[in-house]
């Protein structure tokens, strides 16, 4: 982005450099819940891909309940005070022309919250599938390569 602005408008600023990592933080942290929703997160499908639908549901439930939810809640718990500290102190970048830091830090607890909410949604969908009140599509995953 900085190179684009510099060459197009003959203008450069440290804020253009810093906005890049703000945008990266937003893309990663706010996009994580969407990645979970469409089941494109990283995992090893060597065994999972050969299991029955019911076994996949149980593995997903275990992973969501034992790992994803506790981790996201704990990370949000850790990130929230960091955000508040930056917000109340008005922490700024040490670079000349730099930006305030709290908007980028807000992406952490917001992203963890969104992944937690999506994790709860995934748990509800899997429990509904086990109760035969919701139909899940197990064919959207990419085949093993």
Task: Label the model's feature ranges.
Residues 1-145:
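Alpha-helical transmembrane segments and membrane-interface helix-loop junctions
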């Amino acid at each position: 982005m900085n190179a684009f602005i510099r060459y197009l408008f003959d203008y450069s600023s440290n804020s253009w450099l810093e906005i890049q990592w703000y945008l990266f933080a937003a893309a990663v942290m706010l996009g994580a819940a969407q990645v979970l929703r469409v089941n494109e997160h990283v995992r090893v499908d060597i065994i999972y891909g050969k299991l029955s639908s019911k076994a996949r549901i149980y593995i997903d439930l275990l992973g969501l309940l034992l790992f994803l939810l506790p981790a996201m809640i704990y990370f949000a718990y850790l990130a929230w005070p960091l955000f508040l500290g930056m917000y109340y102190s008005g922490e700024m970048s040490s670079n000349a022309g730099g930006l305030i830091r709290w908007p980028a830090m807000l992406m952490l607890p917001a992203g963890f919250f969104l992944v937690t909410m999506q994790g709860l949604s995934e748990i509800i969908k899997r429990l509904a599938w086990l109760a035969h009140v919701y139909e899940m599509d197990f064919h959207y995953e990419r085949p093993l390569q």
